[in-house]
Amino acid sequence: MRTALLEVGLEELPASEFYNILEQLETRTRELLKANRIQCDSIEVFVGSRRFGVLLRGLPEKQEGFVEEKKGPPLNVAYDSKGAPTRALEGFLRKNNATFEDIIEKDGYVYISRKIEGKAVEEVLPEVFEDLVMGMSFKKPMRWGTGEYEYVRPVHWIVAMLDDRVLNLTLFGLRASHVSYGKRYHSGALKINTPEEYYEVLKSGYVMASHEERKKSVLKQLEDFERTYGMKVERDEALIAEIVAMTEYPRILVGQFDQKYLELPEEIIVTAVKHHQRAFVAHKDGLTNFFVAFQDGPQSSENVVKGYERVINARLEDARYYFHKDLEMSLGEMNERLKGIVFQERLGTLYDKVERIVKISRKICGELKFPEDFTEKVLKVASLCKADIASKVVYEFPELQGVMGRIYALKEGMDEELAFAIEDHYSENPETVIGSVLGMADRLDTIVGNFAIGNIPTSSKDPYGLKGKADTVFRIVRKNEWDVSLEELLNFAASLVGFHLSNDLEEFFSSRFYQFLINEIGVSYDVARAVNHLWKKPLRGTLAAEALQNISERPEFQDLFVGFERVHNITKKHDSREFDGALFEKEEEKRLMNKFFEVKEKVLKALERLNYEEALQYLIELKPYIDEYFDNVFVMVNRDDLRMNRLGFLKNIDDLFMMIGDMSHLVKRT
């Protein structure tokens, strides 16, 4: 078996493209090998800050062969009445360079059928590698030189090998070779004799090509630090991923900032160290003044550590100044300053937005029938929930929006529960009821406001993150089990910005509810479609989806499905619900009517208690009565009064089912 290597060497990749490239390499390599009929024992992809590529192990000598079939003329055209080949058949064979031995007959036609041998793998791999490299997509590609080429970053070298031979491949005007390059300023050209030695050769040039190896190295160095210093470092996965993406030879650095800054709230210190310097803070019976960073390369680290310490101390000195200046103002005074900060063009200032949040929060509390004293607490927090945006610390560290609101509120003596809600309302999954009310109100205002001024997301663009905000609204409703009318809340929020519930807005929430049910509740696509019309009452829609999903996995699902299907199919074009039981002629009609009234009462009571599983069980009881009805009653009779009466009656049954879901969307389970 054979081994192949592709490495594309570029200028430094942006960290934001790292995992995009990694995912594409894994997916496209597998797809291209399959499309070219090349078996492979293992596919190893690698991405570094200056390179990416694949290592293929266990390749065959050649592609798999295949049988090619090409359709020719019909039999009655290919042969004359005596069975002799016609000129049409001869021309077909000549055109395809085939012989009579290649002919088969199938479905009344002549076909050429012949086995095509696979090409040698060294002939095919250059095409595979070219398709792989040139078929990748990037968020912001760039041009270089004369502008002839466009790619994620300028390409400087290509390595393409099969065993010890260089493949015939040219990309971006560069001919492939067996020469790679190590760490900039620390290593020159690196000759690769075979793909098998690739990783070790690059290590000699201070490059860990494997991102998995770099991650293991980072974690090992963090463990060594903890063991040596007796401290703990929080494993921030996002930060670790960023370090893995930005370094090719990560090496730990240990530094200290001035102890006087430990008087600052821990959140400020962590943000200054982690978010702004990509370093970890260390704990030992609380936060210490130690930090851990990673440099790229083997160079002496003393000057680098001093550089980190200088920058972090400067950032913390600024933060300390801003923090103490902020403490000279109350949250109420900060809130007044929101009058000078624009929220969005045509949607007013942040102060205007806060006023709308207060009003929407009151509406939500009213819908949920919260006690007045609790509502007053909600509104108190709502009126201050954006105040910290006017603070100096948040201006310098935007990541602390909400966090500083909580800290300043506590400094003013606000109850801890209320102070935490200021931070909590920013969460995509708020922990508190107050945070949930504010989070929902805030997001409804943002979504409706953007639709009002024409900022409508598309399938590919959502610059204001409205899809995620809608998902959070549904998440809040489900978590808190709030039986609210989203339609009513949207209409109210829209009225505050001179808007209305448009078709675009309805379709947006309907589509997000569908995705929410699939991605977060975990129901199947057909179940999500069945209840999607219930998005205006999202708790009920979610509970209906969960109940339908559960019953669809049980034997009685067939009874439910068939019962609905028989009623729904005959009534879907009928609108009237009017019927008169006195016009029923057959006992089967009367029995179904009596059972329907009995079941309807039970179903409505179950739905009032939000027990959709119980409601479905009651609906199943209708199945034998529905079967008996259709076996003995002809609905579409010639008499208009009887036909309309029967359809009106059945439409009532259909409506009862539809309160839980449109089961015509459900796929029959076997």
UniProtKB/Swiss-Prot annotation:
<keyword id="KW-0030">Aminoacyl-tRNA synthetase</keyword>
<dbReference type="Pfam" id="PF05746">
    <property type="entry name" value="DALR_1"/>
</dbReference>
<dbReference type="InterPro" id="IPR009080">
    <property type="entry name" value="tRNAsynth_Ia_anticodon-bd"/>
</dbReference>
<protein>
    <recommendedName>
        <fullName>Glycine--tRNA ligase beta subunit</fullName>
        <ecNumber>6.1.1.14</ecNumber>
    </recommendedName>
</protein>
<keyword id="KW-0648">Protein biosynthesis</keyword>
<dbReference type="GO" id="GO:0004814">
    <property type="term" value="F:arginine-tRNA ligase activity"/>
</dbReference>
<dbReference type="Pfam" id="PF02092">
    <property type="entry name" value="tRNA_synt_2f"/>
</dbReference>
<dbReference type="GO" id="GO:0006426">
    <property type="term" value="P:glycyl-tRNA aminoacylation"/>
</dbReference>
<dbReference type="InterPro" id="IPR008909">
    <property type="entry name" value="DALR_anticod-bd"/>
</dbReference>
<comment type="similarity">
    <text>Belongs to the class-II aminoacyl-tRNA synthetase family.</text>
</comment>
<dbReference type="InterPro" id="IPR015944">
    <property type="entry name" value="Gly-tRNA-synth_bsu"/>
</dbReference>
<dbReference type="GO" id="GO:0005524">
    <property type="term" value="F:ATP binding"/>
</dbReference>
<dbReference type="GO" id="GO:0004820">
    <property type="term" value="F:glycine-tRNA ligase activity"/>
</dbReference>
<dbReference type="GO" id="GO:0005829">
    <property type="term" value="C:cytosol"/>
</dbReference>
<keyword id="KW-0963">Cytoplasm</keyword>
<dbReference type="InterPro" id="IPR006194">
    <property type="entry name" value="Gly-tRNA-synth_heterodimer"/>
</dbReference>
<comment type="subunit">
    <text>Tetramer of two alpha and two beta subunits.</text>
</comment>
<keyword id="KW-0067">ATP-binding</keyword>
<dbReference type="GO" id="GO:0006420">
    <property type="term" value="P:arginyl-tRNA aminoacylation"/>
</dbReference>
<keyword id="KW-0436">Ligase</keyword>
<keyword id="KW-0547">Nucleotide-binding</keyword>
